[in-house]
Design a protein with these regions (language model features):
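Domain-level signal for soluble alpha/beta catalytic cores
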Residues: 1-473, 477-807
Length: 807
């Protein structure tokens, strides 16, 4: 098969299976880097590739999954040497069978900012080095797989698009709840990866065929019918006795049969699968044609954890905009991000679904500020952003660091504007707002505005932007100055919907400028526009009347089924003028958490929950003027972290928010440490804990997250790092008199090392308990190897520590 035939196949093609599984069976030594075998034992690697190609794999992944500068640190070989050898081995093995060689690329093993310490551009640079080496060595395509962080996948995709001409397959790993480890949804992955230029999207690892199927179905529904989709499930889960995985090749082939209805581009296997698994898939997918029936694509804007499908009226918060706001302009000039972040949090709480972001003000460097504000906003809100600027460089810098799929506000009908902005939207996968205005100005007639909108739509389509990502703003003119043109805006909006098939947007509040009682005009105009087909309403979400109009409209047009959202928002509300309202204000909070948030610690607790580091520090300083340091910890910080942890467990808050809350709590703890030091006191630890990623395992993202959470609960953590020898763990526990140990392992190949570490701790007769965690672990396996607890995540680790130390 030739590369140019890759996406023209008449039958679902087969991918390969697990490489680590085969190497483990061949006796891979604990701690050895699998990728170094490309150089030290090429015959072994070629043999595995050849087995997969002979079994029917049309795309075979080179043994380069961990060939990154991060994971090869300390190796005798350079990244380029390892990748070149890996590609050459695979090509030699595949040549007799006509299979293609993919440069296999996995995560770098470090969390990106703001959740971690790896800078986005540093990640792009490292991936650029990887993909350039792969293309130079002769790879036919790039296969990004096993990603859990959408931001890291974006860095990888940008590196590939900017530095190579190779086709790209992109895959993420999802947990049983339908999200990745960092909380990314299937739909956000699909929208972002497709927008950034991936040629196919898929799901691999983590789970078996039955568990992945519902997510694969969602993935297929989230992309056009002719867009390639693939899967590579695991062979179930590792057996507790360490004898492999719990799904046989025959059962795997049987469980893959339902995937025929998805008309996949390709299918294969991941952990636990072998050439025998792939061979049986030939029968499973015989006669299965790729590609699904065409369907109307939704318009999706997203962050990793929040996917907003624009189907009907959607509220865009307008308050992050310095126009006419002296305090906001001052905050931007002074770099006061806390003020900006507070605007975001308050709008999200009021019900905004998207946030408009405009940082254009006198005396500021707008491109620099746009990048800074986008990064800062992503640390405290999961709402998608609308980047609002006429400055092309500002848009470019904001788009580059945005995590997900944003919308740009805006371009217009002027050819030079279209030429400057549409390519940016195409490159970064953003939706675009087109203003129905050109070099001749605003046209009074609806038909003339529609004509401009048509030109914008045609230009956007020609630039490769899909119709569902095109939004037209027919321009809201002030009723005080151009009353006769108000209806023309509504008429033009309705015509754009019907004639062009695009989405629409309006800055609603402009209608009332210069007139009294603006809310009346805004709400009435909003209602008129919604009836005409308005999709995005840029408005103040704190306006109760306007928000009520939105919710009521969705009920009356049957968009809010069973009035669910309307009831959720308004069930407990009563008119402010009634006696009932006064009684409601005096009523006790519905639960303990709400009661806490009404007390003297409410502001600090809210700052921690929302991840507002500056506010958390400021509120802590204010409290310390009246309260004792440990009182602030016990009455505010620990309860706030408990609230965040409970939301994390319930799935209403996700890893990025958990880490930002921990970061905000840490800023508060720093103030408390300073206060204690000034009093000449020492801060007491709630307990000492050793953490380590076991020998042979270089993955420590999960362990690092556990450390952050434990430290914020007041525990002293001795972090031994990754690839930690058994004797180092034992010696540290003995010498430091530690009574609780946390061990982490990500790979099946290092589970034996975890078992050996636990056995050594027991043999040394140390007075300690052991908790274990990692992607490949199960409660049953943890019990089998002698662990006292299985910690499924960082929150559970904190609960175990609190239980153990009695705090």
């Amino acid at each position: 098969m030739q590369v140019n035939e890759l996406f023209k196949q008449s039958n679902t093609i087969l991918l390969d299976g697990g490489m680590g599984t085969m190497l483990q069976a061949a006796g891979l030594k604990l701690g050895a880097r699998p990728e170094e075998l490309n150089i030290t034992d090429p015959a072994l690697i070629e043999g595995i590739h050849a087995q997969y190609a002979a079994a029917g794999s049309r795309i075979v992944n080179a043994n380069t999954f961990g060939a990154s500068a991060h994971k090869l640190a300390g190796s005798a070989y350079t990244l380029e040497q390892v990748i070149t050898a890996g590609i050459e081995n695979c090509k030699r093995a595949c040549a007799p069978y006509g299979a293609l060689t993919a440069l296999d690329v996995g995560p770098l093993g470090e969390l990106l900012e703001p959740s971690g310490t790896l800078a986005f551009e540093d990640a792009v640079a490292e991936y650029a080095r990887i993909v350039k080496a792969g293309e130079a060595a002769g790879a036919d395509l790039i296969f990004f797989e096993t990603y859990t962080d959408l931001y890291e996948l974006k860095a990888a995709l940008l590196a590939a698009k900017e530095n190579t001409h190779l086709p790209i397959l992109a895959s993420m790993s999802f947990e049983a709840g339908g999200r990745t480890f960092t909380g990314c949804t299937v739909e956000s992955f699909a929208a972002t990866a497709r927008g950034l230029g991936a040629d196919a999207v898929g799901i691999n690892c983590s789970l078996g065929p039955k568990e992945i199927f519902p997510m694969a179905k969602r993935l297929a529904e989230a992309v056009p019918g002719n867009f390639p989709v693939f899967v590579k499930p695991n062979a179930g889960l590792p057996r507790a006795d360490g004898s492999g995985y719990d799904i046989t090749p025959q059962l795997f082939a049987l469980q893959m049969k339902p995937y025929r209805e998805l008309h996949l581009f390709a299918a294969g296997g991941c952990c636990g699968t072998t050439p025998e698994f792939i061979k049986l898939l030939n029968g499973t997918f015989a006669g299965c044609t790729p590609g699904r029936p065409a369907h109307r694509m939704p318009s999706v804007l997203c962050t990793p954890v929040d996917t907003v499908t624009v189907d009907g009226i959607t509220v865009v918060g307008e308050r992050i905009n310095p126009t006419g706001k002296k305090r906001f302009q001052q905050a931007l000039r002074e770099g006061d991000m806390n003020y900006v972040l507070e605007q975001a949090v308050s709008q999200a709480e009021a019900g905004a679904q998207i946030l408009d972001v405009n940082v254009g003000a006198p005396g500021v460097d707008e491109p620099v500020l746009m990048e800074q504000v986008v990064k800062a906003l992503q640390s405290v809100t999961s709402l998608p952003l609308q980047l609002d600027s006429s400055n092309v460089e500002a848009l470019a810098r904001g788009l580059r660091v945005y995590n997900g799929k944003p919308i740009v506000n805006s371009t217009n009908g002027e050819p030079e504007k279209l030429a400057a902005i549409l390519p940016l939207c195409k490159k970064y996968g953003a939706a675009i707002v087109g203003l129905a205005i050109d070099e001749k100005g605003i046209q009074p007639k609806a038909a003339d505005r529609v004509a401009i909108a048509r030109r914008i739509t045609e230009a956007a389509l020609a630039a490769g932007i899909p119709r569902e990502d095109i939004y037209i703003d027919c321009l809201t003119l002030t009723a005080s100055a151009q009353q006769e043109d108000v209806l023309a805006t509504v008429q033009a909006l309705e015509a754009c919907k019907k004639e062009l098939g695009v989405r629409t947007v309006l800055g609603v509040s402009n209608i009332s400028f210069g007139l009294p009682c603006r809310t009346y005009l805004n709400t009435t105009f909003l209602t008129m526009a919604m009836y005409a087909g308005l999709d995005l309403a840029i408005m103040n979400p704190s306006s109760e009347e306007m928000m009520a109009a939105v919710y009521a409209y969705n009920v009356l047009t049957n968009r809010d089924k069973q009035s669910t959202k309307y009831i959720e928002r308004f069930a407990d509300r009563v008119p402010a003028s009634t006696a009932l309202a006064q009684a409601a204000k005096a009523a006790p909070a519905a639960n303990a958490a709400e009661a806490e948030l009404t007390g003297p610690y409410a502001a600090l607790m809210k700052a921690v929950e929302k991840g507002l580091k500056g506010d958390a520090a400021a509120h802590t300083r204010a409290l310390l003027a009246e309260k004792q340091p440990l009182e602030v910890v016990d009455e505010a910080l620990i309860p706030a972290l408990d609230i965040v942890g409970a939301k994390y467990e319930k799935g209403t808050l996700f890893l990025p928010q958990l880490l930002q809350a921990a970061s905000a709590a840490q800023s508060a703890f720093e103030e408390i440490k300073t206060a204690i030091a000034q009093k000449g006191e020492g801060s007491a630890s709630k307990g000492r804990i050793v953490l380590a990623t076991v020998k042979g395992d270089v993955h420590d993202i999960g362990k690092n997250i556990v450390r952050v959470i434990l430290e914020n609960y007041g525990f002293e953590v001795l972090d031994l790092g990754r690839d930690v020898p058994v004797e180092t763990v034992v010696d540290t526990v003995r010498e430091k008199d530690v009574h609780l140990v946390g061990l982490s392992a990500l790979m099946t190949t290092t589970l034996k090392s975890m078992e050996e570490t636990i056995a050594a701790l027991h043999a040394a007769k140390l007075d300690c308990k052991i908790m274990v965690g990692g992607a490949v672990l199960t409660p049953e396996y943890a019990e089998k190897i002698g662990a006292d607890w299985y910690a499924k995540d960082a929150k559970r680790s904190a609960d175990i520590a609190k239980e153990f130390f009695g705090v």
